[in-house]
Amino acid sequence: MKEAKHLGVDMFLLDDGWFANKYPRQNDKAGLGDWEVTHDKLPNGIPHLVQVAKDAGVKFGIWIEPEMVNPKSELFEKHPDWAIHLPNRETYYYRNQLVLDLSNPKVQDHVFG
């Protein structure tokens, strides 16, 4: 990151793919909703990256999409009822994902808690 700082980079953004262990995020088919660091990809965790960025004088940001879930995720396995389902309609998967029902207090606690 020090080299990036010298090039004028002022923020490091950790994008999609840093999360999920049972179903690691390798593509858009799995892992969304399991917001735990993938140990294989980041063995030192996110705090290490934050410190490296700080030491280099670069801000740190991280991508999340807390309102979405992949059917192939631990979250969906445990709580399939948390995804929005419309009665008498076929389930629609946009990019292999579903929208969590943020009107559900349990979902709110999970996302914002």
Walk through the language-model features, giving the residues of each.
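Aromatic-lined carbohydrate-binding/catalytic grooves of carbohydrate-active enzymes
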Residues: 1-113
